[in-house]
Amino acid sequence: GVSNFTPAQFALLQSRLPFTLATNQVEISPVHQPLLLDGTLDQLQQLRIRPMAWSCLGGGRLFNDDYFQPLRDELAVVAEELNAGSIEQVVYAWVLRLPSQPLPIIGSGKIERVRAAVEAETLKMTRQQWFRIRKAALGYDVP
């Protein structure tokens, strides 16, 4: 696999290899959403390749940056609606809800963090909840 390749870079490398690339490891989180619009996830979905998602929690920005307080508030509301154990679980559920079916990379060896990510698989996030989180992270309505 590769890491942080644009669709053009991925296609170029793939065209020169005698084997199929396994994945593209990319940053995906509510606080980092460009890949939802730049074709990266679309390309991987078209090729039936599951991306690996790094920094799902935004490298701590989600919890430490005042700019993301509205996002934290919305994540807390959705956590209550889903009966989730934490907003962290809701973030992982948000990533898992993407049609490209990303595989989150858990950047921690702490068992409680790994458990939160695994338990996110059981959350049944609605499309409306997903878009509310997207809107709260962006700070404006999603067209």
Each model region followed by its residue ranges:
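Beta/alpha (TIM)-barrel catalytic core signal, keyed to glycine-rich beta->alpha loops juxtaposed to Asp/Glu
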Residues: 1-143
